[in-house]
């Protein structure tokens, strides 16, 4: 499996800065060339340098899959136009919601999405249409409503909060149609997304992620 430890801007919380699917990886401007080369090599995608809401916290603000990308309503017009032009094979939409941390509130692969319980019916419909998923439901993971922050799911597997119950795991596996395991990142963090960036081709983990955590991640993501 293509897997590599990584730090960005002096932190191991790489998932707050990076968004990826199987076609594109969106990263902050200002990364050094070696870091960008490593990201491309591991994830096997085209690299797009961008901002959202004049911020580099792309992994927090963006959610999506190979079909579509959702941006928060705080996205500035020129940022939206730039991503719309460069994410050519994906539908790109702004979700007009008071919720802006879409990466933390939507967990998705190409088949399904689990979303923040407080999204309304209109927001749920837009999310489903933009992502082109067959299934969508509102819910929690290990009593956490910020479902995108405590899990990462690809089309090959998934890793979620270590306190997720067996019943929840089975429900998640049925929803996403992949095997899903529990684990941690960055030496014990339950906020999986903050330390794990993955697609079907490769995985980046925060630099403080331990050997046992990496073994669990590799198994969970289907490698």
Curated annotation (Swiss-Prot):
One of its GO terms (molecular function) is translation initiation factor activity. The keyword Lipoprotein does not apply. InterPro entries: eIF6. The keyword Protein biosynthesis applies. GO terms for biological process: cytosolic ribosome assembly. Keywords: Initiation factor, Protein biosynthesis. Binds to the 50S ribosomal subunit and prevents its association with the 30S ribosomal subunit to form the 70S initiation complex. Belongs to the eIF-6 family. This is Translation initiation factor 6.
